[in-house]
Amino acid sequence: EIGLDGFVPELNTPEAFAQQQLFYKAQLKLAKQYQLPVILHVRRSADLLLKGLRDTPVMGGIAHAFNGSLQQAHAFISLGFKLGFGGALTYDRALQLRRLAVELPLSALVLETDAPDIPPHWLYATAAQRAAGQTQGRNEPAELPRIAQVLADLRGISLDEVAAVTRANAIEALPRLK
């Protein structure tokens, strides 16, 4: 996984962010040289990542935990990327993400868990619940079928179709998964 993190404060000092950009560009060059797909860490950095991909085209990959705009989604897709959707999709309040999951072609989506991070809503414990002693549920790959069911319900299609298409998409994005 390569990319830029525009969210974590200590990674966003001018020096740290410049270093992130330096590493990102170097990693893109390696991916291009060795004809490897990349999994992109896209955290408040989609436009800068897209610029890097236009400057150094690679064979595609996955924009992990995608949470950008429709325009950014289409830009990643046009560059050969699939968009990763996971636990965040399960939250009713994730309106933009849910809208994207319905509006974008299913052929552009892959499912992921980001385990143990980004838990689906059924595992999430609020700060108040955690303060009261409730533990945060542990996200793991076993949650993927339920996340897939959420996507199927949002799109009004079968779980089997979501599973088959997103599996094929993952193999297309990361051919060595075969």
Please describe what each predicted stretch is.
Residues L11-L22, A128, A132-N139:
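Alpha-helix N-cap and loop-to-helix initiation/capping positions
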Residues T13-L111, P119-W122:
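Catalytic pocket-lining loop regions of alpha/beta-barrel enzymes
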Residues E1, A31, F76, A101, ...:
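Conserved, mostly hydrophobic/aromatic
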Residues S107-Q129, G133-G137:
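Short acidic/histidine-rich active-site segments
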Residues L30, R138-K178:
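Mid-to-C-terminal alpha-helical segments outside catalytic/metal-binding sites
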